[in-house]
């Protein structure tokens, strides 16, 4: 079903790959993009389980918007191993205004399709999704 605000549908592969990340831990991260030709959100890239947060941030385009989910492993102050799934809305300052508006208007609908998101981040610059910020939001 298309999003009434932006007309963007969510591709079935997006939901399927997210379920694989969440339940099987098949991927470390997934990036998604809006395909304006088909008017839907589609999978852009899949990060392998051994990929790092640096691999993830390096995969984000410098001047194009993306949505992403990242399975973040961390150790609490009590020395417990935990994991949280982050939803990241990447809208760099250098991206086109139309693209920023399209991603902003489709975000909430897309996020609702991904059941199991625990933390949300919005970033317009790489510093806004640094490892320090991610760790602070996870704890």
Swiss-Prot record:
Top-level division of the source organism's lineage: Eukaryota
Domain ADF-H: 5-139
Entries under InterPro entries matching the protein: ADF-H, ADF-H/Gelsolin-like_dom_sf, ADF/Cofilin
Gene Ontology CC terms: actin cytoskeleton; cytoplasm
Gene3D superfamilies listed in its UniProt record: Severin
Gene Ontology MF annotations: actin filament binding
CDD domains: ADF_cofilin_like (cd11286)
GO BP of this protein: actin filament depolymerization
Keyword terms of this UniProt record: Actin-binding
Family, similarity comment: Belongs to the actin-binding proteins ADF family.
Function per UniProt: Actin-depolymerizing protein. Severs actin filaments (F-actin) and binds to actin monomers.
Name of the featured protein: Actin-depolymerizing factor 6
Organism: Oryza sativa subsp. japonica
Classification of source organism: Eukaryota, Viridiplantae, Streptophyta, Embryophyta, Tracheophyta
């Amino acid at each position: 079903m298309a999003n009434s605000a932006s007309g963007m549908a969510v591709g079935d592969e997006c939901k399927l790959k997210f379920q694989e990340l969440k339940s099987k831990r098949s991927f470390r991260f997934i990036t998604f993009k809006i395909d304006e030709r088909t008017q839907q959100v589609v999978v852009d890239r899949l990060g392998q389980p051994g990929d790092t947060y640096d691999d993830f941030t390096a995969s984000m385009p410098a001047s194009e918007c993306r949505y992403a989910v990242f399975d973040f492993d961390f150790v609490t102050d009590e020395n417990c191993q935990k994991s949280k799934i982050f939803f990241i809305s990447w809208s760099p300052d250098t991206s086109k205004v139309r693209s920023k508006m399209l991603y902003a208007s489709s975000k909430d609908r897309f996020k609702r399709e991904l059941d199991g998101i625990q933390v949300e981040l919005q970033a317009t610059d790489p510093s806004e999704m640094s490892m320090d910020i991610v760790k602070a939001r996870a704890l």
